[in-house]
Design a protein with these regions (language model features):
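Hydrophobic, small-residue-rich transmembrane alpha-helices and their short perimembrane loops
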Residues: 30-274
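N-terminal secretory/membrane targeting signals
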Residues: 1-31
Length: 274
């Protein structure tokens, strides 16, 4: 009989072997996007400007978008809020921060597994040079950092918005109350797009054309890995909040959608996520 560790090791080895067999069979049949070579951006022009100039101007547009998002962040942070509401929102943020730290460790463990597959596929099966493989590995980390950083920013600004929205709702004015979460969503959206585009434009502008393909492949893998892991675990995290809300109904003997239960929104969100 195998021990628990031996069974887990054997199962992982079987998974790796299956993946390698699949990759070895697919490698001769398909070309890789990592082999794409970008043209010289200075050789084409639009409206009297070279392609390089237009993309370089795009970086400034993206940076302006990032500044726009940070301005909304500062506005939300400086809004008035009751001390009790602020205390609750900060407690929620500390809980979310613990979740993000744990999730970051999990993503890095998952990345080690994915990176080993990338090394085997691109280095052994596709016969890429060492520098190309290292570029793919490096930019996969850049992609993960982009997803993870924006996720952290989103949780931080949403906990700001929660307490400020609750305090503004005491005045009974719908539009000013509605504008607060709307600003939070705009801030996250503009910052997300701006950060991702700045990285992609930097690859187009400052990385040699023959190395841009590996950079984009690594960046896409990292972004997808980070976003998928955060989304799946985030759904589980939301479901935990849903269960916590249901438990509070039992403890305090309140109905399903009782306004006295502050976990009603978490309950509704968790039900939809489930």
């Amino acid at each position: 009989m195998f021990s628990f560790v031996e069974r887990k090791t054997l199962k992982l080895a079987m998974i790796m072997a299956t993946i390698l067999v699949m990759l070895s069979g697919a490698a001769p049949a398909f070309a890789s996007e990592a082999e794409l070579v970008l043209p010289d951006l200075t050789s084409v022009s639009f409206f009297g400007m070279t392609g390089w100039t237009i993309l370089f101007l795009g970086i400034f547009v993206c940076l302006a978008g990032a500044v726009f998002g940070m301005v909304f962040y500062k506005q939300l942070r400086d809004m008035p809020v009751h001390s009790s509401m602020l205390e609750v929102s900060e407690l929620i943020y500390e809980t979310c921060k613990t979740y993000l730290q744990t999730q970051g460790k999990f993503i890095m463990l998952l990345w080690v597994f994915i990176a080993s597959i990338m090394v085997v596929y691109f280095g052994w099966l596709r016969h890429f040079s060492i520098d190309r493989v290292l570029l793919i590995i490096f930019f996969s980390l850049v992609g993960i950092a982009g997803s993870y950083g924006v996720a952290w920013f989103g949780i931080r600004i949403n906990t700001f918005a929660n307490s400020r929205t609750a305090f503004a709702a005491l005045k009974g004015k719908p539009f000013p109350t509605y504008a607060i979460p709307l600003k939070a969503g705009i801030s996250i959206g503009t910052l997300l797009i701006s950060v991702e585009l700045v990285i992609m434009l930097a690859i187009l502008l400052f990385v040699p054309g023959e190395y841009a393909g590996p950079c984009f492949i690594g960046f896409a893998i990292g972004e997808s890995l980070g976003a998928a892991a955060l989304r799946i675990a985030g759904g589980i995290f939301t479901k935990i909040a849903d269960i916590g809300s249901d438990l509070m109904k039992i403890v305090f003997d309140v109905k399903e959608d009782d306004a006295r239960n502050p976990g009603v929104i978490a309950d509704c969100t968790g039900d939809n996520a489930g």
